Amino acid sequence: MINIAIDAMGGDFGEKPIIEGVLKALEAKPFNAILVGNSKILKPLIPKKLEQYIQYEEASEIFSMNENATDALKNKETTIYKAINLLKEKKVDAVVSAGHSGASMSLATLRLGRLKGISRPAIATLMPNIVNKTLLLDVGANTDCKAENLFQFAIMGEVYAREIMQIQKPRLALLSNGEEECKGNELTKESHQLMKKIPNFIGNAEGRDIFNGEIDVLVCDGFDGNVILKACEGVATAIFQLLKNEVKQSFISKIGALLMKPSFKKLKKHTDWQEYGGAPLLGVNGCVIISHGKSDSRAIKNAIFQAINFSQSHINKLIENELGKYNA
């Protein structure tokens, strides 16, 4: 059975939504949950019928969102340090954390090490499009990149799309300010030349192309990726609020909204980041799923499902093998 370490106290809202997410996941799929945190606080939240699937790893401290990620290695009593250490010692198959994302990334890189051929790991996230989903990476691990980093991100994203998203030939693109090969800054142009070696590379793409369903993997540096991610979250929230405001304007619009309620529900589900759970940190020697600090129980449940799928695949070995083809 898969063993998943969960940073049980690292999210913005404390342990309650995290434990609720773990319980929902256990009701859907069997796995062993290792809850990292204060067992005196956590144990009363676990129903007897699920106790057999729960273990505890004591951790007395939480790495604060206000702390610098570079300090994560210093305090070995934090929940995220203990969780990553369990993975390093191969006592678990994956880690899920809604805590400090910088600390998670820093500890995973330093404690677990990078995959062969990878110079920097990348955070990958799923973005909704009009057909299905687009994998965007990097979305925050590396604000400054070299062309070789983006090339490695492309390989990791392509393998992830193939193995986890089940896309046989994922269409891979590079984010730029125009589709033409000559567009972009020096980093983009140099990266484009490297990515031309990849058979599934379809060229440059603009930000709007994330949503048209014609791209499966979009590569960029962590600065641009994070700006895109946060902007999209804001736009989605604003659109639904504008719809609510318009619905309230008249009786007819309220009737129309009532008739459209099933469609609105489907749309909201498709665009809701909680449905996607978390973001895998690709390129480290293990499975680390980074969840949003504001994750509710549904997001934690879905992040755990991501961790299970990742752990059951051989994605890290496949990434190394794929990179080896280009480094030979």
From Swiss-Prot:
Pfam family membership, one: FA_synthesis
UniProt-recorded Gene Ontology molecular function terms: phosphate:acyl-[acyl carrier protein] acyltransferase activity
Residue ranges crossing the lipid bilayer per the database entry: none
Record flagged with keyword Cytoplasm: yes
A Gene Ontology biological process term: phospholipid biosynthetic process
Localization per record: Cytoplasm
Keywords assigned by UniProt, alphabetized: Cytoplasm, Lipid biosynthesis, Lipid metabolism, Phospholipid biosynthesis, Phospholipid metabolism, Transferase
Domain of life assignment: Bacteria
Pathway named in the protein's UniProt entry: Lipid metabolism; phospholipid metabolism
EC number: 2.3.1.274
Catalytic activity as recorded in UniProt: a fatty acyl-[ACP] + phosphate = an acyl phosphate + holo-[ACP]
Subunit structure: Homodimer. Probably interacts with PlsY.
HAMAP family assigned to the protein according to its UniProt record, in alphabetical order: PlsX
PANTHER family given in the database record: FATTY ACID/PHOSPHOLIPID SYNTHESIS PROTEIN PLSX, PHOSPHATE ACYLTRANSFERASE
The protein, known as: Phosphate acyltransferase
Organism for this UniProt entry: Campylobacter jejuni subsp. jejuni serotype O:23/36 (strain 81-176)
